[in-house]
């Protein structure tokens, strides 16, 4: 059962154009839609726990490793963020306890989501590496997925390092989302490990990955670039100036940055790096 079907069974009829569901203990359900916000009924603490259990297939233990990071990903690519009391051993998270809220981000396949920048990926016949940049919830993952599909359809061997299971939503190793006919996916492991394995195993022409952030990710992508592989990736930033202050994110791997606009699917700026 897909995530929206599960939520509808748990919460009743959902509004159309749904992008995100936020459920907070003792507060009204909040629905963020393409045309604005809606609010639903109050979610008591015991019901919030029941909804979390149902989304996790009544096996929170199996999701323990993900929950320590504050989220888990559904089989169709939707991500369930979990907030509450995080139990730590020093600086190492060991468990998520006393759940206070859930944030379900709806995974969407939108053909054409990359149209605003796809042409800029090419300089003549040469493909360039690009970093897709925006704040949260403005379509970076959707645009990356669509670009991977289109490059794959256009003849490139594409590899996806899908740490959070959101780009391809693999089930038993097979993508549930359309990422193209020439695409291979390594999912469920840290990006820097996946990139290294893909270089060895799949002879990629293009590597696609989501939300790079630390130096290990950037160094793995730098090694891929040295091998002649083009990179498409995303990073959180509110502006290209903010991005420039975080050189560790891209380490000269990328030829251009694409800043998405204030609405999903809109491109605000494309700049050479």
Q: What spans do the regions from the language model cover?
A:
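Hydrophobic anchor at the beta1->P-loop junction of P-loop NTPases
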Residues: 130-132
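P-loop NTP-binding catalytic core
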Residues: 60-127
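P-loop NTPase switch/communication element
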Residues: 151-198
């Amino acid at each position: 059962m897909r995530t929206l079907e599960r939520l509808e069974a748990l919460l009743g009829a959902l509004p159309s154009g749904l992008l995100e569901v936020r459920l907070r203990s003792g507060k009204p359900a909040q629905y963020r839609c393409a045309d604005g916000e809606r609010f639903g009924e109050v979610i008591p603490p015991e019901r919030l726990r029941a909804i979390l259990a149902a989304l996790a297939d009544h096996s929170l233990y199996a999701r323990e490793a993900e929950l320590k990071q504050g989220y888990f990903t559904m089989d169709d690519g939707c991500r369930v963020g979990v907030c509450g009391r995080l139990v730590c051993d020093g600086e190492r998270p060991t468990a998520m306890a006393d759940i206070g809220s859930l944030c379900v981000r709806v995974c969407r396949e939108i053909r054409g989501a990359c149209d605003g920048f796809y042409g800029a990926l090419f300089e003549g016949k040469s493909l360039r590496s690009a970093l897709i940049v925006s704040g949260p919830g403005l379509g970076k993952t959707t645009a990356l997925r669509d670009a991977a599909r289109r490059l794959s359809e256009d003849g490139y061997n594409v590899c996806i390092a899908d740490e959070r299971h959101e780009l391809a939503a693999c089930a038993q190793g097979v993508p549930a989302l359309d990422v193209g006919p020439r695409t291979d996916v390594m999912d469920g492991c840290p990006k820097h490990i996946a990139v290294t394995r893909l270089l060895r195993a799949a002879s990629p022409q293009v590597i696609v990955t989501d939300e790079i952030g630390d130096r290990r990710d950037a160094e793995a992508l730098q090694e891929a670039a040295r091998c002649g592989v083009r990179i498409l990736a995303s990073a959180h930033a509110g502006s290209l100036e903010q991005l420039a202050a975080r050189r560790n994110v891209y380490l000269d791997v990328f030829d251009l940055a694409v800043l998405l606009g204030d609405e999903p699917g809109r491109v605000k700026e494309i700049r050479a790096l």
